[in-house]
């Protein structure tokens, strides 16, 4: 277990299993309050599995919308547009699994940009391109 806490903007991510610690098999992380909504986007390199720990969430995957509560899980395959939001803004916790590993690097780069004072549209664009994320 990594135990790494990454912060950038209003985002807080606890990395439970990094790509490095799993030999590249997966990344496992938790989004912590005050969670922000994630707009529609596509991953080209990994699948994404959302598991609700706290709060009520709406996960869009393709043309389907799932309203889920603690214990609920939704799978978003790579290449399919998806988004997530909380029913009560700012509340909730999500455990997110992304196989194969590597996606934790996206958050690590944004946290480094925050620490360096360079977090902004250019940092998001560079990290998104590097990690195969297209924002729609």
Where are these regions (language model features)?
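Ligand-binding loop in jelly-roll beta-barrel domains
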Residues: 78-104
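Short, conserved beta-strand element in jelly-roll/cupin
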Residues: 28-34, 42-60, 97
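A short glycine-rich, His/Asp/Glu-containing loop-to-beta-strand
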Residues: 5-40, 46
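Acidic/histidine-enriched, glycine/proline-rich intrinsically disordered or flexible terminal extensions
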Residues: 108-136
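Structural motif
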Residues: 12, 37, 49, 56-58, ...
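Short acidic-glycine-tyrosine-enriched beta hairpin
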Residues: 21, 56, 63-79
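Residue-level recognition of conserved beta-strand positions in structured domain cores
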Residues: 30, 42, 61-63, 70, ...
């Amino acid at each position: 277990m990594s135990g790494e806490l990454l912060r950038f903007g209003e985002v807080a991510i606890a990395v439970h299993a990094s790509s490095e610690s799993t030999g590249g098999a997966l990344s496992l992380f938790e989004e912590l309050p005050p969670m922000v909504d994630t707009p529609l986007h596509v991953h080209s390199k990994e699948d994404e599995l959302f598991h609700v720990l706290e709060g009520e969430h709406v996960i869009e995957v393709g043309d389907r919308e799932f309203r889920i509560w603690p214990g609920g899980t939704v799978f978003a395959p790579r290449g399919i547009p998806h988004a997530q939001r909380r029913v009560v803004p700012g509340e909730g916790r999500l455990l997110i699994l992304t196989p194969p590993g590597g996606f934790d690097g996206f958050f690590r780069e944004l946290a480094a940009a925050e620490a360096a004072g360079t977090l902004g549209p250019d940092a998001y664009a560079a990290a998104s391109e590097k990690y195969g994320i297209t924002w729609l």
